[in-house]
């Protein structure tokens, strides 16, 4: 039997249109990222129907992101094992000539889109190394906090053990230009190893022996200004762009038979001097200019910047536009010795983590297993790792109301950050573990706590869903609940449903757990709760109902406008929005009637509810009336699933098709358990 990992991976690939529709595949901390040839054949709804998928986000006209959470790397590796996908191991499709094919983002602002995509895809592959290094920094800062060793002391004043520990994180940042050069070249379609070799040449002992940063030396008879390229990001980015054009020109000039030898030879021969003389200093100037501009804004009003940054992040992250800011943070550390973006960014992160913590507490109270899992994963990934994507895609982007709970937390946290003028002296991901990296760390702690608890309390007091979404969730939980305990039994005996087996009921019982009353061989026939055409559930254009995940049954294409009780029953749940009602019949059968699809978004308009929860109803009593024409005018399907939500208590359950069904037509037969 295939594992869940394999099944989900196959499900994603199949609904993306298969390997033939994919031109590129990569992943970041939480998302699988695809470029596809034809976005129209991607079945986003079907991909999202898998419980392991947190969300599906289109990008431009050819990009697709599938949000998987912290286990994304496992799914990425599993998809690579599938037929037709092995050649995507380097991210993009490769022909026999090794020339990479890239579809890219295409749209009205394709140039701007691609610029941001280029920066984002350059830094994403380096994320793991940056995360690891940031936690090593945190350990050293903690040692400083507890008075064990000064983090900022010169290396010649530190014990050998701490010098070695510093080398563990400095390896990532010192050689960052090499990593950036490789990933930037790969993104552009140039040779990634040549892209890495160009900045590497400027970090060699031989180059460093030429002199100190700021010195001018003569090379090839020309003056060369020396710079410290360790930790720089803009020089390798610009060098990679130059390499792309040089390689492209060389491949037009050099015969294919000898390109493998002479293209890399001339690329290195041209690009290393070009970078050392021109592109490198220019890149440092660009980085310093951006850093100085932001520093001027920060010096003018740290308070304003501290508020603007956390309020912007919730809108940048879904678009992937936050990644380029990492380059600016690193540049600030290289230029100024500190960074003023990471502190305020922590306000956004902890407002986000506070929000999902509130969602988790509500899910615990409601016994909502699905939301409990999603919110717990987002909470742990955030508080311990500083990763916000699981929270963003698992909760925030699925429930529109959440932004009204999130932004006040961002604002309050940003105000506190501005008051304390928070600075970071190392590049870290803002989590509980990296608090000591901020200065003053106590002020930063107050800021993230303010952001966290503001958003969490807003969720607890006002919920994270609209009234209709909350009712929808409760209806689905009631429908999916398949336990022996059920809501209170009626206060007085009620006659059994027509066609049901006789049932005994204790008069005067008020809070008795009702058990199914169908023995083996007994049968209950359920009539249609509304007039219309009875069709198989498989015809419902919703993967959850069509697959029977909420229970077996039948679907009705309404010709009338009233839902009635098919038998004597107790209303166990009814939506305020009127689009769904759940009943427990005297036989113990629990029935969910869901009027139309996506009708929750109407917020009750077009529906009139005639009953309330725990009310006793007789066969034929009206439950809900609705306006079919109004619903159709909103382009919403009216097909109404009628499903048995506690099917595991019974034997075979059969839906019966009918060209015209009404209150006298049997549409579902439920057999007693063997």
Curated annotation (Swiss-Prot):
Keyword Cell membrane: yes
Active-site feature positions: 28, 594
One CC-aspect GO term: plasma membrane
Keywords on record: Cell membrane, Kinase, Membrane, Phosphotransferase system, Plasmid, Sugar transport, Transferase, Transmembrane, Transmembrane helix, Transport
Residue ranges of every copy of the PTS EIIC type-1 domain listed in the record: 117-476
Catalytic reaction equation(s): N(pros)-phospho-L-histidyl-[protein] + D-glucose(out) = D-glucose 6-phosphate(in) + L-histidyl-[protein]
Main location per the UniProt record: membrane
E.C. no: 2.7.1.199
Localization terms from the record: Cell membrane
Ranges where the PTS EIIA type-1 domain occurs: 542-646
Broad enzyme group: transferase
GO biological process: one example: phosphoenolpyruvate-dependent sugar phosphotransferase system
Membrane topology: Multi-pass membrane protein
One Pfam family named in its UniProt record: PTS_EIIA_1
Residue spans crossing the bilayer: 126-146, 162-182, 193-213, 225-245, 260-280, 303-323, 344-364, 376-396, 409-429, 442-462
Record text about domains: The EIIB domain is phosphorylated by phospho-EIIA on a cysteinyl or histidyl residue, depending on the transported sugar. Then, it transfers the phosphoryl group to the sugar substrate concomitantly with the sugar uptake processed by the EIIC domain. The EIIC domain forms the PTS system translocation channel and contains the specific substrate-binding site.
Function, as annotated: The phosphoenolpyruvate-dependent sugar phosphotransferase system (sugar PTS), a major carbohydrate active transport system, catalyzes the phosphorylation of incoming sugar substrates concomitantly with their translocation across the cell membrane. This system is involved in glucose transport.
Protein name, per record: PTS system glucose-specific EIIBCA component
Designated gene of the protein: ptsG
